[in-house]
Amino acid sequence: MFCDKTNVNILTSILLQSGITDAVVCPGSRNGVIVHNLHELTRTASPEHPFRIHAVTDERSAAFVALGISLAQDLRPVAVCVTSGSALLNTIPAVAEAFYRQIPLLVISADRPPQLIGQLDGQTIPQTSALAPYAKTYTLAEPHTEAEVHWCRNAACEACIALKRRGGGPVHLNVPLSEPLFSFTTPRLPSASPVAFYETEDGAPPAALVSKISEATLPVVIVGQCERKADILERLDEENKLLVLPELVSNQANAHRTALLESSPELREQLRPDLLIHVGGNLVGKQLKLALRQRPALSVVRIQQNAGMPDTFMHLDMLVEAPWQNLLARLRPLLREKPAVCRLRQQLDNAPYAIPAADIQHTAMTAIKRHLQQHRLPLSAIHLANSTVVRSAAAVFNDGTFTLRVNRGVNGIEGSLSAAAGNALASRKTVLAFIGDLSFFYDQNALWNSALRGNLRIVLFNNSGGRIFKHLPGLNDSPASNSYIAGAHHTSARGVAETHRLEYLSAGSPDDLPSAINRLLTHEAERPVLLEIFC
């Protein structure tokens, strides 16, 4: 029987399936349940995939013993399991050695519940990052919900992947455990499948990925934030090999599809992919992401060059570390047309787009886009501030015609205007910034720069507070919502414009827009031009 600690059983299952066959174990009470499970593996593992444990009393020696076992097995990952407190610190010499020699040493430490840290409890120290900078810590918190079980499994998977990533190295897995500890009535381990990991510097597609796509009925590519266009996506899309769903901030063609899916529950219901390939950075839309998380039979492949293991759609089963554009280009000749892709692509491209309820913000963006297209103004980029502005832009700038820049790495309101100012300083072309009032006043120091020129044009939507807060269910029930949470105010940007010698324009109704937009986009100016639109 295995122990009754869910996080320990998930860890045990992932270790067994990740190719770890040896563990060095040290004495201790808090890690006793982990050692029990590892011992059970020696009894229940198959003859084809045996599991061995090695008892060593001294933790400093034990970690080096594990290192030696790894060396003897052609750098196969080996675990060392220690109890809480100073026992973990004793592994540092071996961990440092493993770091500099790129030896995949997995240090598994039992830990006390986090609320006991700093309470003068025995063998209780802050163990997260205790082995830094030599080993990154992954924590397997005790899960109490289905979602927490999922993230616990992910942490164990990511730790095992980190052992092999970029030549290999040491990793720290910290396992907090509350009392009671010693109950062993679980007959079998959970079916916690590991995330398959492939690393390819030249973008050669793994055979397992080719098979996945070949077997899929409706393979979909969701493209998050990108800074430049990827032509390979259009080719795959035109050939109906993959259904490409780019986000607004991806700077790809066909972002109107994602905008449609965000706004239409009926279309989201019809989108039932069996394989999702996820590339690019952050996503703006929420509804499509939530719908895909609820698809029970969805398989997700993440392709990226950087470290980490984002499981945005909560169905990740393969991680490929590679330049995704190169990989998709090399995949293309290996794939065939998919009838389901063709059908859904046509449906999305022919579906009528529900124009948002006419407001001055949407009207202004539409008019500005029309003016830019008609007059072919040399434009470096359009910068979008976060919150309402970027969501409104999804209904207008979704055809990949313009280069869009958004601070979606963290999604904060700070720095939107500063990033646009930096772009304008480095370019001779026009930089256009759309921004809301809170973001503007928060970042107004971006304009405190005498080097800024007239190629920076700013459209400020002033609705006297954070409009996005009005769309949060239940928040309006709070008497603090308007003044204290949404940042309600009665401020105009006219004074800011005068202070920094900007040309100031304003519009208070749709009738004011045509002349104001025409001057904003055509007037020669030595300093930035600001159009404030009162919503």
Task: Describe each PLM feature range.
Residues 71-72, 90, 222-301, 309-312, ...:
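Glycine-rich, anion-gripping cofactor-binding loops and their flanking helix/strand elements
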Residues 109-159, 246-346, 450, 458, ...:
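Glycine-rich, acidic loop regions that bind phosphate or pyrophosphate groups
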Residues 1-2, 291-388, 492-496, 507-535:
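Phosphate/pyrophosphate-binding active-site segments
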Residues 21-24, 51-53, 72-112, 272-280, ...:
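A short, small-residue-rich loop immediately preceding and capping a beta-strand
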Residues 108, 113-128, 392-535:
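Thiamine diphosphate
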Residues 48-50, 155-158, 162-215:
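Conformationally flexible catalytic loops at phosphate/diphosphate-handling active centers
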Residues 4-96:
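N-terminal cofactor/phosphate-binding cores enriched in small/glycine residues
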Residues 8-11, 16-19, 29-30, 34-38, ...:
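Active-site diphosphate/adenylate-binding microenvironment
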